[in-house]
């Protein structure tokens, strides 16, 4: 009976640790997304401006590349992939 009680307590503790870890990851992801909003506000107008202009100079391509790198870093850091559609729209499809 004591072994069963210890086993149940161990499983409950393990579930609690896993749940807490998942909650922290979710909170971290939310913080990263909030942080990314600032970068998005900075980058999106520049990306749209670069894409909207005809022709491509080295300077324009460099700015677009920098913004896409920032978005890439943010999406890799946050596992919820909320930035993937943004990257596909601004960095992959229209930039080519």
From Swiss-Prot:
InterPro entries: Bifun_inhib/LTP/seed_sf. Keywords: Allergen, Disulfide bond, Endoplasmic reticulum, Signal. Disulfide bonds join 29-78, 80-91. The keyword Iron does not apply. Residues 1-22 form the signal peptide. It is found in: Endoplasmic reticulum. GO terms for cellular component: endoplasmic reticulum. Belongs to the 2S seed storage albumins family. This is Conglutin delta 4. It comes from Lupinus angustifolius.
């Amino acid at each position: 009976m004591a072994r069963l009680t210890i086993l149940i307590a161990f499983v409950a503790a393990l579930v609690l640790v896993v749940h807490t870890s998942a909650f922290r990851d979710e909170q971290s992801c939310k913080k990263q997304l909030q942080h990314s909003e600032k970068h998005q506000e900075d980058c999106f107008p520049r990306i749209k401006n670069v894409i909207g202009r005809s022709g491509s100079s080295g300077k324009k391509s460099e700015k677009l590349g920098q913004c896409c790198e920032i978005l890439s870093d943010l999406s890799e850091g946050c596992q919820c992939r909320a930035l993937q559609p943004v990257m596909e729209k601004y960095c992959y499809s229209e930039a080519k």
